[in-house]
Structures are given as structure tokens and as C-alpha cells.
Amino acid sequence: MTLFFGWKVVWTAFAVAVFGWAFGFYIPSALLHLLHERRGWSVATISAAISWHYLLSAGIIVYSAEIHARFGLWRVTAIGAVLLALGALGWVSATAPWQLFLAAIVSGAGWAATSGAAVNAMVMPWFRAKRATAISLAFNGASVGGVVPVPLFIWLQGAIGLVPATLVLAGLGAATIVLLSALYLRPTLASLGLRPDGAADDDRQAETVGRSIPRTRLLRETRFVTLALGFALALFAQVGLISHLVALLAPSLGMTMAGWMVSAMTIMAIIGRTVLGFTIGGADRRVITAANLAVQVIGVVLLATTTHPALILVGCTLFGLGVGNLVSLMPLAAHAEFEAVDVARVVALIIAINQATFSFAPGALSALHDATAGYLWPLVVVGALQMLAALALLSGRRGQ
């Protein structure tokens, strides 16, 4: 039996997510420490450049559906991978802090073309019956991007230097994505004479981007507003906690054990996303997301109230189970609630809103930590935001 071509697209999207999240999301956080340590630049300045990287990317993501329609998904992905690699090289080659903001323009554009909106656009046309499984598998690359490339980058830069390490890893990664894009993203369902796996033909799939709901109208729709608000609050809380997790745990566990806790959380994110992808079926995506957030809140409570290693591990496990699902549940909810012609635009716009929002999360929690001389209140805020996110999502369900 011939393997359905869509699964090759899924694994290509997985590879794009590994590369995109590694150099677009995780490694900038590592550079915050490395550039501060090596160059003596202020944490505030480097953090501002990272926020600029995220905000610029968010602005581009808003128009990703039109960009893909105009230039082709495979071309945009290939060019984005090259830009992300060049941007990363610009970050580590900077000799003055202002140059980070120039590098962020390039890296932000590359991250926009290799992040969640792009992964969704790759997978969406190929699946219907197994869409949840396909999207979950593809988005697992986002977690792997933090598990493998980041430790490798940190080790390699210590062995051969910051610039050579970036040149090797980013160069190899970009070359791989360019090749995979040409091989597996260039063909389309129409060019191969195929239909979405497990689904009948649907004329709506062929409609143009111009026929979709205007953004101004989307911003007035309850289903969109509650979906965007819920995931923006949830991801603000999640990114904020993850960015501070080592600093939170190191005083009681030590750096090595804190690192293992982060790894455990990431592994649980992969497990949680994979299991949900195979089992979610036709369940209400908003209810599942709210339950996902409730489990994470229990984990946050444990992290806020204990210093016992075993209980901290339980807290990281519970929080980690939901980490990956937040990224993949949003596209699945959009697929369930919007017409096929609108999904790409809806997903891109929500991802842009999410990214613009969570770009301020690390700094906001840092400010709260400094103001309260500890992590108790930052964790209270994280838990409260997750509960508000769940309520926002459920309120949208009632209004449908």
C-alpha cells in the first residue's frame, strides 16, 4: 500500500517546526544569557530586541495567508528558513547592542515563515478525518526544537565558539528545510490528483483567500474574540512560566536538577500532544482546552506551594502535559468552528495576537518578581490567567 503523500508533508512540517522553534523561539532565550555574559550587554536591552523579534514576526504572520497565496507555501517556507538562519547569525555576530534590532528584523521575518501559521498551512489541506493526529504530530516538532537543538547549540558554542556553532547548526537546518520544502511542500493535492485523506471533495477548499471573512469582521465575532482571548491569556501565562522555570526551581533544586525538570516538562508536552491527537476525535475543542488548562493550574499550584523534588516533578509533569496541547488545540478549534476558506486567515491572526501578547510575558513576570521579591505572586498570576483563559473559551462555546 502506497503511503499517502500527506504524511510526508506532516513530517516536513515537523522538521520545519523543529528548526523554526529552535532558532525562532528557544535559542533567542539562550542568547539572552550568552550575550549578556559574553558581551556585557544589559538584559533589558537584549530582552527588548527579543520582543522586537517576536512583534515583527507577529505583524508578518497576520498576512501569512495572503503571502502564501501570492508566492507559494514552499517558496515562502524555504526563504523563511534562510532568513531565520541569517538572522541568527546576525544575532551572534553583533558587536553593538543596536545591531541586535537589525538582526531581529531578519530573524523575525524568518520565524514568521516557519512558525505555527506555516505549520498549519502545510498540514491543513491534506487531512480531514485524521487532521487532529496530523496536526499534533507536526506540532511535536515545536517541542523537539527545544529538546535537541538548544542543548546541542549550547554545547557546540562552548566547543567551537558562538558564531561557528550558529553557522553550522543554522546553516544545516536551513539547507534541510529548503530541500524538504522543494520535495514535499511544492506538490499539491491538485497536482498529484489526490483528495484530503478520508474526506470527499469540497468546493470550499478551492476558494481563494479573497473570499474569506474580512479581518475587521472577524474581530467583531464572538467565536473569534473568545478563541483569540482564551489562547492569548493561556500562552502569556505559559510562556511567562517557562521562561522563568529554571530561575524558579534552581534555588531549591540546583541548576542540574532544574534542567532535568525542564526536560521532563518538555517530554510530557510531546506525550500529551501525541495522545490527544490520537484520542480527541470529535470532542469539543474548547472544553478540551479548558480541561487542559485546569490540569496545568494544578501543576502551577504545586510549583507555588512546595519545594519537595517529587512534588515539583508532579507539578512540572501536569503543567507539561498541557504545554504542547495549547499550540495544537487552537488550529483544531479553528478548523471545527470556521469554514475551510477562513481557517488559514483565522489561525494566522490568532497566532499573531498570541505572539504579540506573549512577547511581553517574560518581562512582566520579571517585573512582578522584582516587585514582590519572589515567585509566589507571579505564579498566582499565571494560575489566574489560565483560569480566565478557560472561562473565555467556555463563554464562546455558550455563545455559538
Language-model segments: residues:
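Helix-loop-helix hairpin linking two adjacent transmembrane segments in secondary transporters
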Residues: 142-189
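C-terminal transmembrane helical hairpin of 12-TM major facilitator-type secondary transporters
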Residues: 265-269, 275, 282-333
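Intracellular juxtamembrane helix-capping segments at the cytosolic ends
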Residues: 113-127, 325-338
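Extracytoplasmic
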Residues: 8-43, 64, 150, 241-246
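Conserved MFS/SLC helix-loop-helix module at the cytosolic interface between two early adjacent transmembrane helices
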Residues: 59-97
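Interfacial helix-cap and linker-helix signal at transmembrane-aqueous boundaries
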Residues: 35-36, 67-68, 148, 152-160, ...
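Helix-to-loop junctions at the C-terminal end of transmembrane segments
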Residues: 60-72, 273-284, 369
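Extracytoplasmic gate region of multi-pass secondary transporters
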Residues: 28-32, 219-271
